[in-house]
Amino acid sequence: VIMPFLYESRQHKRSSRESLDCALALQELTAIGVDNIITFDAHDPRVQNAIPLKSFETVQPTYQFIKALLKNVPDIHMKPENMMIISPDEGAMGRAIYFGNVAGVDVGTFYKRRDYTKIVEGRNPIIAHEFLGADVSGKDVVVIDDMISSGESMIDVATELKRRNACLLYTSPSPRDAH
């Protein structure tokens, strides 16, 4: 089975009494005879542990993403002096490093500083998005993540990058999630 979007892939960690819907879906697929599952940029590839005796492959669409970016954005220049790849949080850092290495440009990241003295809607609220990386002033930046839920963090990150005088700013979830 080729699944461009892995069903319930954000449901990869168990909190309280939640089910592991992604793991259950993979197990159900193998129960009906599926031996091989291919997906694109799984949110957490460790979900393959739910089906240890079956084939599970997560394909990184990095080349296709960079090719589409260069084809559709004529003003972009993938040179270290002109561009950076930015991770919006710690969870996307591996993906950003991979993209940065493939594109041959620097990488930066944000971390979410949280107030651990409060809980709002079941989470500790984010106080600020702190940037770690080289100066983005005058550079085109691509903020890359695998999924966007509400978009609130992405807006905060984009706002901070513009405050730091980044030029052209592109935000994108993985190509399989961009709709």
Q: For each predicted feature, which ranges?
A:
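RNA-binding accessory domains that recognize and position tRNA/RNA substrates
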Residues: 2-54
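Single conserved hydrophobic/aromatic residue that forms the stacking wall/gate
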Residues: 170-173, 177-179
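Basic, amphipathic juxtamembrane/active-site segments
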Residues: 155-165
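Short, glycine/charge-rich flexible loops or terminal/linker lids adjacent to PRPP-binding catalytic cores
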Residues: 9-18, 53, 57-70, 74-81, ...
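Short active-site oxyanion
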Residues: 34-36, 82-85, 169
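Generic enzyme active-site microenvironment
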Residues: 2, 39, 87, 143-144
